[in-house]
């Protein structure tokens, strides 16, 4: 069947819901929270209209939502949920259980700032606070990547038996409408066949226990196997991303998308919708003679160390844009990037710019101002101040 995209004007949240529908998810368990709610509402609409054969489990909290997903996934079902901010924090314990039990659940997290004070706007701290739970994390720049990301996340997760989080920006994507090219169901089915579970609690001929006590003699190896699965996932992510591109014309074979790096003195590095603004700014800066490029981190977990080293070897500096912060330290992407480069031969000048916390706008003008600051760093050959809270009101 020839690929002819079905173009719909949808929000990022509706793109996620359509992707779950097209992935033929079997069980959805979720609890509503702004700005995630319309994902689950749309899925409920699909069920009510007879468009989807999905078992929907209404629960009393996000902790229960993930617990229900764990139970469903452990029986072999393809399982989906979505949450945001405080809801994701409430899920924290169960995220460890899902990863430790090697269950390929896919969850959409709509990035929202953590309270207090209350905020419903974009901030990556909620998802990045869960970086050590064993979940893979894919960050979408736009609504198209939300849709594509969910489909690819299932294929990767079910190959390596590790859960995956697809992350989109609150309101900037979740409630903003754009054209999304959707894939005919028959072609999605060819790309994403039915799940073949690693084990199933519904297989009564081979009964097993999941999450039972492991003594010190065994626990260590369980952790090692999960770590190896994340390493294996890097290869699978590239293979799945390449296949997706060959089938549907949108290539995701690189864990870090780059632009203009061949002759760049420095690059902007960041994740999510912020990088759409960066791309526009870089296009304008290039016309003004700036030797600047960009590196958009698509997959934060597993961390694309090898690709980052290759990029770092070709530039003099990296301006890391973090829409998050680890208190007592610095931006989280900045910390991870420095650690990845420490034992490599690449040692570019690196400066961390904290931007956009709590949904504060980051404009093309802001990026151009940061470019001017980074240009001075390159010209001087030293970093004057490693971490800058850009546009801080005083």
From Swiss-Prot:
Signal peptide: none
GO MF term set: 3-methyl-2-oxobutanoate dehydrogenase (ferredoxin) activity
Enzyme type, top EC level: oxidoreductase
GO BP: any one term: sulfur compound biosynthetic process
Pfam families in UniProt: PFOR_II, POR_N
Record-linked InterPro entries: PFOR_II (IPR033412), Pyruvate:ferred/Flavod_OxRd (IPR050722), Pyrv_Fd/Flavodoxin_OxRdtase_N (IPR002880), THDP-binding (IPR029061), Transketo_C/PFOR_II (IPR009014)
Keywords for this protein: Oxidoreductase
Disulfide bonds: none
Reactions accelerated catalytically: 3-methyl-2-oxobutanoate + 2 oxidized [2Fe-2S]-[ferredoxin] + CoA = 2-methylpropanoyl-CoA + 2 reduced [2Fe-2S]-[ferredoxin] + CO2 + H(+)
EC number(s) from the headed UniProt entry: 1.2.7.7
Superkingdom of origin organism: Archaea
Keyword Isomerase: no
Record note on quaternary structure: Heterotetramer of one alpha, one beta, one delta and one gamma chain.
PANTHER family, per database record: PYRUVATE-FLAVODOXIN OXIDOREDUCTASE-RELATED
Protein name per the record: Ketoisovalerate oxidoreductase subunit VorA
Originating organism: Pyrococcus furiosus (strain ATCC 43587 / DSM 3638 / JCM 8422 / Vc1)
